[in-house]
UniProtKB/Swiss-Prot annotation:
Residues binding ATP, per UniProt: G89, Q90, T91, G92, S93, G94, K95, T96
Pfam families: Kinesin
This protein's name: Kinesin-like protein KIN-4A
InterPro entries xrefs: Kinesin-like_fam, Kinesin_motor_CS, Kinesin_motor_dom, Kinesin_motor_dom_sf, P-loop_NTPase
Cellular component aspect of the GO annotation: cytoplasm; cytoskeleton; microtubule; microtubule associated complex; nucleus
Tissues of expression: Expressed in young tissues with cell divisions, including initiating adventitious roots, primary root tips, flower primordia, intercalary meristems, sub-epidermal regions of young culms and panicles.
Record's subcellular location: Nucleus; Cytoplasm, Cytoskeleton
Outcome (variant: K986A): Reduces nuclear targeting
Keyword Cell wall biogenesis/degradation recorded: yes
Coiled coil (residue ranges): 380-437, 498-702, 850-904
Biased composition regions of type Basic and acidic residues, renumbered to the chain: 882-898
One GO process term, biological-process aspect: regulation of cell population proliferation
Gene encoding the protein: KIN4A
Role of this protein: Microtubule-dependent motor protein involved in the control of the oriented deposition of cellulose microfibrils. Involved in wall biogenesis and modification, and contributes to cell-cycle progression and cell division. Acts as a transcriptional activator in gibberellic acid (GA) biosynthesis pathway. Binds specifically to the DNA sequence 5'-ACCAACTTGAA-3' of the ent-kaurene oxidase 2 (CYP701A6 or OsKO2) promoter. May regulate CYP701A6 gene expression and mediates cell elongation by regulating the GA biosynthesis pathway.
């Protein structure tokens, strides 16, 4: 395989920020990674990084990752360029999901399925021009062993369970292991791996699925399906392009040497994630796998650091490819013959801030790696090209020999042929690129327009020929013209004729409408004339009637005048008028009477109506009264119920208020304690981080001084004290790194506890109406003890503390990352470069031995002290338990004595008996007795502090109530001997009863006690002596 040199290009780096997963949300994790809007820039804490692409979070959507990053690599694969897609990141950051390594048939999630689909789509488009061959291989690196995942024997072994419950894999006996080989041209190959020829996407997906099932996976605390190995899925594409044939002198093509071979590989790498044993909870086999994973990733990080350092690259520094099989296989992808895209998968959770920061740092270094991708051609193609040039040279010489052509002309022809071939190749390549990118010829729209115009012209011709009434005779001048002019004239005449026809039709339509309107107008005019004639006739008839009426009036007037002329008629008229007047007078009188009767009836009707109205009002008032009374009762009952409900609610609110106040104080105290703890831990972390930073800066400056000294005087060497000081400083740095690491772990645990409580409270807040709210680790539910306001206050306080803790974690992660990075730079051989002789090494080794011995002795002494303190603590715990049990027993007996005393003193008619029982019970070992003390009783014997007589010595003593068990033995004996006289004296004085009650009862019952004491003294008399035997205990 030969290679054509290309231009250098940098490794492209894309960052994929996955969202928070369910476990992280339950822990209350916050986003510690922010993406600058509109820019491929990521910020975490005080660090800022710029990459080629950023996906997820507030950056570019993840769906665009393939088109922007991987699709160009697939296109380059058809041009003969190798390509690599590398997924790197912490365990559980989404590498396998992003790559799609574990996809199944029909899935389109991930880079690998989409790459396969794009690859076969392009093959389908070019299969008529190029002959393709596809091969795939799938390997994994498990515990520094290369395993073939496509080998049927390996796949048939499957997974077995070992004693620890972990899944492991067995090797196939008799099968040689896969070996890494390097060809003469520097290409890395795998000897013994299986390469499967595929022709369809389904076959390739089946190979991927088979290898994924055989890959080593396991469950950890951070991921249920964690990849335990580095997986590399390789697609090899071979192309055979047909070139232009070479013609012989006889014009016959040479068929045997007209092909071009290209071979390119696409490596899709899914790395196992870096992990910490404390976070993953791995042990046994899982722990060993994690160690090998971290070792391979460390070697990869060293390779990235060596290639990304421009100074080392210019100096030609050694790149440790051979430190790991992973870096050995990725030698071409990192700094070699490949176009490489690195996808850094990160988690935005604050608990993963340190690992996220380290991933971003490695990805940032990877951007500085320079690759040199070149076109990979088959050696057969080179040989064909060489033979083609030789044939052309021989043909030119033969032509020159036969035709006597001058050699200079032959040379010129050769140059011209080379130039034309080069131009032809460029044109072919351009045509190939245009076809691949779906290029469209800009002349095609114009050709379509011309074709459309020509088709339209043909249609016009056919229409003109079919239109016989509009045929126009052609003149001689037209006949004599060219065919093009004739066609134009015919087209114009046909268009004019069609226009005239359309206009004629429009005019006919207008005439028809006009005639219709005129006929309507005529019809309306004839109707108007008929109406006019009708109303004229009516007017004439009315005039005739008017004249007839006037004539009748005149005739009647004449008759009246003729009647007035007759005298007899006049007398009769007078008589009739007189009679008429009399009748009119009677009518008037009757009308007046009628009017009076009507008026009386109206008044009676009014009075009846008033009475009826009053009766109705009375009934209405009575009904309203009954309703009002009923309403008053209802209102009173409702008010009583309302008042009772309100009082009940008020009591509940008061009780709730007291409970809330208690909860508030309790939460305030809890928040204050947690804030103090958080503040203390934060301050300790800040101090440790600050001290670590100072030590690192001091070591860095001392390292520069030492390097400068060594550079100025190569022969000089450090003194013994300088070496010891330097070693002490390095040990101090390691100790502080360990301290910061411990503080980081404590802060993480505190952060997890706060997050868990916050998640539980938020879930309870959402499900506050549920019957059984979720419980925490201690099994207690806060839903029954926290009110909504208290819960919200607690949530706000926890969110504030979680934010502070998250910021602290991010800052500590940044410092730890820097410390580990510097420690990595000083580790290995770099730490001991300052030693110049064996004597210095021996001296330093002796000093290290002394330091280790002293440390071991101090550890042993501390262990002995811890053991002694544990023993003392055990003894003190035992004593404390015994004391606590005695205290509980004492409190129980004291409570029983108090109940017995209260029962005895409050029983009516049994004052003496009560006093006797109480007094006799006081002789028990744990009963109170009167002994001298510095505290005096508030009240002396007697009623209302009356001075006591007859017993001055006893009343003047200072008394104190103490348990009998705390008295010495001699005191107990003396008290036992004097008890008879003492209690006889108490029973002979009834005033002691009041003093006893005042001592043990409630103060506000003093007046009742005094009255009861006076009544008791008047009714009872003291007995002459006490009974000799001890009475039973009053319970």
């Amino acid at each position: 395989m030969t290679m054509e040199h290309g231009e250098d290009c940098c490794v492209k780096v894309a960052v994929h920020v996955r969202p928070l997963i369910g476990d992280e949300k339950l822990q209350g994790c916050k986003d510690c990674v922010s993406v600058v809007s509109g820019k491929p820039q990521v910020q975490i804490g005080s660090h800022s990084f710029t990459f080629d692409h950023v996906y997820g979070s507030s950056g570019t959507p993840s769906a665009a990752m393939f088109e922007e990053c991987v699709a160009p690599l697939v296109d380059g694969l058809f041009q003969g360029y190798n390509a690599t897609v590398l997924a790197y990141g912490q365990t559980g950051s989404g590498k396998t999901y992003t790559m799609g390594t574990a996809c199944k048939e029909g899935s389109h999630i991930g880079i690998i399925p989409r790459a396969m689909a794009t690859l076969f789509d392009k093959i389908d488009k070019l299969k008529n021009q190029v002959e393709f061959q596809l091969r795939v291989s799938f390997i994994e690196i498990l515990k520094e062993e290369v395993r073939d995942l496509l080998d049927p024997a390996t796949a048939a072994v499957g997974k077995l369970e070992n004693g620890n419950g972990h899944a492991t894999k067995l090797s196939v006996p008799g099968k040689p292991p896969v070996q890494i080989r390097e060809a003469s041209n520097g290409v890395i190959t795998l000897a013994g791996s299986t390469e499967v020829h595929v022709t369809t996407q389904k076959e390739m997906t089946a190979c991927l699925e088979q290898g994924s099932l055989s890959r080593a996976t396991g469950s950890t605390n951070m991921n249920n399906q964690s990849s335990r190995s580095h997986a590399i899925f390789t697609i090899t594409l071979e192309q055979m392009r047909k070139a232009d044939p070479i013609m012989t002198l006889d014009g016959m093509p040479i068929e045997e040497m007209n092909e071009d071979y290209l071979c390119a590989k696409l490596h899709l790498v899914d790395l196992a994630g870096s992990e910490r044993a404390k976070r993953t909870g791995s042990d046994g086999l899982r722990f060993k796998e994690g160690v090998h994973i971290n070792r391979g990733l460390l070697a990869l990080g060293n390779v990235i650091s060596a290639l990304g350092d421009e100074k080392k690259r210019k100096e030609g520094a050694h790149v440790p490819y051979r430190d790991s099989k992973l870096t050995r296989l990725l030698q071409d992808s990192l700094g070699g013959n490949s176009k490489t895209v690195m996808i850094a998968c990160i988690s935005p959770a604050d608990i993963n801030a340190e690992e996220t920061l380290n991933t971003l740092k490695y990805a940032n270094r990877a951007r500085n790696i320079q690759n040199k991708p070149i076109v990979n051609r088959n050696p057969v193609a080179d040989e064909m090209k060489r033979m083609r040039q030789q044939i052309e040279y021989l043909q030119a010489e033969l032509v020159s020999a036969r035709g006597g052509v001058v050699l200079d002309d032959v040379q010129g022809l050769r140059e011209r042929i080379s130039m034309l071939e080069q131009k032809n190749e460029d044109l072919c390549r351009e045509l190939y690129d245009l076809r691949n990118h779906g290029y469209t010829d800009p002349c095609e729209p114009e050709l379509q327009k011309i074709g459309t115009g020509y088709t339209k012209g043909e249609g016009l011709k056919r229409s003109l020929q079919s239109t016989e009434p509009f045929d126009v005779p052609m003149t001689d001048s037209v006949r004599a013209g060219s065919p093009k002019d004739i066609d134009d004239e015919v087209a114009k005449e046909w268009e004019h004729t069609m226009l005239q026809d359309s206009m004629g039709k429009e005019l006919n339509e207008l005439n028809r409408q006009l005639e219709q309107k005129e006929s309507e107008m005529k019809m309306y005019g004839s109707d108007t004339v008929a109406l006019k004639q009708h109303f004229g006739k009516k007017l004439l008839e009315l005039e005739e009637e008017k004249r007839a009426v006037q004539q009748e009036r005149d005739r009647l007037l004449a008759e009246v005048e003729s009647l007035n002329a007759d005298g007899q008629t006049h007398k009769l008229r007078d008589a009739q008028l007189q009679k008429l007047k009399t009748l009119e007078a009677q009518i008037l009188d009757l009308k007046k009477k009628q009017e009076n009767q009507v008026q009386l009836l109206k008044e009676k009707q009014k009075s009846d109506e008033a009475a009826k109205k009053l009766q109705e009002e009375i009934h209405s008032i009575k009904a309203q009264k009954v309703q009002l009374q009923h309403k008053i009762k209802q209102e009173a009952e409702q008010f009583r119920q309302w008042k009772a409900t309100r009082e009940k609610e008020l009591l509940q609110l008061r009780k709730e208020g007291r409970r809330n106040e208690y909860e508030r104080h309790k939460l305030q105290a809890l928040n204050q304690r947690q804030k103090l703890v958080l503040q203390r831990k934060t301050e300790e972390a800040a101090m440790a981080t600050k001290r670590l930073k100072e030590l690192l800066e001091a070591r860095k400056s001392s390292g520069r001084d030492n390097s400068g000294m060594n550079g100025t005087s190569p022969g000089s060497h450090m003194t013994e004290k300088s070496l010891q000081k330097w070693l002490e400083q390095d040990l101090e740095v390691m100790v502080h790194v360990h301290e910061v690491r411990n503080e980081y772990e404590k802060q993480s645990q505190l952060r997890a506890a706060l997050g868990e409580e916050l998640a539980i409270l938020k879930q309870e807040d959402v499900m506050s109406g549920a019957a059984s709210p979720p419980r925490g680790k201690n099994g207690n539910s806060r839903a029954n003890t926290l009110s909504p306001n208290a819960r919200q206050a607690r949530i706000a306080s926890l969110e504030s503390m979680v934010t502070i803790s998250s910021n602290t974690l991010v800052a500590m992660a940044s410092q730890l990352s820097e410390a580990e990075e510097r420690e990595r730079a000083f580790s290995g051989r770099g730490r001991w470069n300052q030693l110049r002789s064996m004597a210095e090494a021996k001296s330093l080794l002796q000093y290290i031995f002394n330091v280790a011995a002293d440390a071991r002795c101090q550890v042993r002494e501390k262990e002995m002290e811890i053991k002694e303190m544990k023993e003392q603590m055990t003894e003190l715990v035992t004593i404390l338990r015994h004391s606590e049990s005695r205290r509980r027993e004492t409190e129980k007996q004291l409570k029983q004595r108090e109940q017995a005393a209260v029962t005895a003193t409050t029983s009516p008619g049994n004052g003496n008996g009560s006093v006797k029982h109480s007094a006799d019970d006081s002789n028990t070992p744990l009963s109170p007795v009167a002994v001298p003390a510095q505290k005096q009783l508030k009240y002396s014997a007697g009623i209302v502090n009356s001075p006591s007589k007859g017993v001055p010595a006893f009343n003047k003593q200072h008394l104190k109530m103490v348990p009998m068990a705390q008295l010495p033995v001699g005191k107990k004996v003396s008290i036992a001997g004097q008890s008879g006289k003492l209690w006889r004296w108490k029973r002979s004085h009834h005033q002691w009863l009041l003093q006893f009650k005042w001592k043990w009862q409630k103060p506000w019952k003093l007046s009742e006690m005094i009255r009861h004491s006076d009544e008791t003294m008047t009714r009872t008399r003291p007995r002459p002596q006490l009974l000799p035997h001890r009475p039973q205990r009053v319970m």
